[in-house]
């Protein structure tokens, strides 16, 4: 019995670290990805606005069944939906004490796995999306709901399970009550830890987006990225420029490709590498997902991601911060196409 338990723990570590690598890739690319997709979404906006859509008004006898654009749809109950978040804090999770420690969700995406086909879809949620979130005072008392950036919902929790639960609720509400079965968050210190653990990565700089910050980072230069400079390389953007997350996308992509390749090489040579890597990052991770979930996600990830979408909308400059205003009509279309089946 003891042997079986130990094997289960070890197996979960293997599943966990592989999914974490996926999380890192998607989290860091998430901000840039939605901006690229934004242009396509805006081009479709006029077409979508020609049709009226009233998601809530279309509710029928069953909460799983809706009338939409003259057709009847049923929620695909073969789906399991999991929320993944990249958090902008830098310390181990167990050191968090108050809201001030929690941080914000720097990247947010939903992985939807179809259990019948063992395939996955990914829905990116722009961090600056304006939506209903629940506000709390510093002592943890709810002050009701307010429309604000979805990424700060995480900050009203404890940086642990409460923050994740709040984000889970906010995302579900944004997606018209979509069920979310689990969550996993990792703060940005995890990237530095993994970078050092694999021994750093060598990268050819893809553009000049960091040249003004560090003259060594000129386009075409070959540099070594370690835990010390990984955060700057991956996360830096000029916050004085609106929607500047797009600029850092190529850097992120180049870094993450090199990181995953290095991790794969290490794992192929060292049977204990995966377990040790998991041990190095678990202090920066919060999840309510068990061994069986990670096993299924791993299997599904090997079949590839069949679809990637972004919550449709438009990025604008708000009074103080960037804002992303969701196109509710287009989002209704997307929810139906991703999570429902026509009957």
Describe each region flagged by the PLM.
Residues 2-7, 12, 18, 30-343:
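Non-catalytic, solvent-exposed segments at the cell envelope interface
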Residues 21-29:
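Core hydrophobic alpha-helical transmembrane segments of single-pass membrane proteins
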């Amino acid at each position: 019995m003891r042997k079986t338990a130990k094997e289960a723990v070890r197996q979960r570590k293997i599943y966990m670290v592989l999914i974490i690598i996926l999380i890192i890739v998607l989290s860091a690319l998430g901000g840039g990805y939605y901006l690229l997709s934004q242009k396509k979404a805006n081009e479709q906006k006029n077409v979508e606005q020609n049709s009226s859509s009233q998601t809530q008004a279309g509710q029928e006898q069953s909460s799983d069944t809706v009338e939409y654009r003259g057709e009847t749809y049923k929620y695909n109950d073969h789906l399991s939906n999991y929320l993944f978040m990249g958090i902008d804090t830098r310390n181990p999770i167990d050191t968090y004490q108050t809201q001030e420690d929690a941080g914000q969700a720097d990247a947010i995406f939903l992985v939807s796995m179809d259990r019948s086909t063992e395939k996955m879809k990914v829905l990116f949620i722009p961090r600056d999306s304006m939506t209903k979130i629940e506000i709390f005072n510093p002592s943890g008392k709810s002050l009701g709901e307010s429309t604000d950036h979805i990424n700060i919902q995480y900050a009203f929790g404890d940086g642990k399970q409460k923050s994740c639960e709040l984000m889970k609720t906010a995302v579900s509400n944004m997606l018209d009550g979509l069920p979310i079965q689990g969550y996993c968050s990792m703060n940005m210190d995890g990237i530095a830890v993994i970078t050092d653990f694999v021994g750093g990565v060598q990268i050819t700089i893809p553009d000049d987006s960091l040249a003004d910050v560090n003259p060594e980072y000129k386009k075409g230069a070959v540099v070594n990225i370690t835990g010390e400079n990984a955060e700057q390389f991956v996360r830096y953007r000029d916050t004085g420029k609106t929607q500047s997350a797009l600029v850092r996308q190529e850097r992120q992509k180049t870094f993450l490709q090199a990181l995953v390749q290095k991790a794969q090489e290490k794992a192929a040579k060292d049977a204990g590498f995966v377990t040790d890597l998991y041990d190095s990052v678990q202090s920066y991770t919060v999840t309510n997902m068990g061994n069986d979930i990670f096993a299924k996600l791993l299997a599904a990830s090997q079949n590839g991601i069949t679809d990637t979408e972004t919550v449709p909308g438009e990025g604008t400059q708000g009074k103080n911060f960037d804002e992303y205003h969701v196109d509710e009509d287009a989002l209704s279309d997307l929810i139906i196409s991703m999570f429902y089946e026509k009957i």
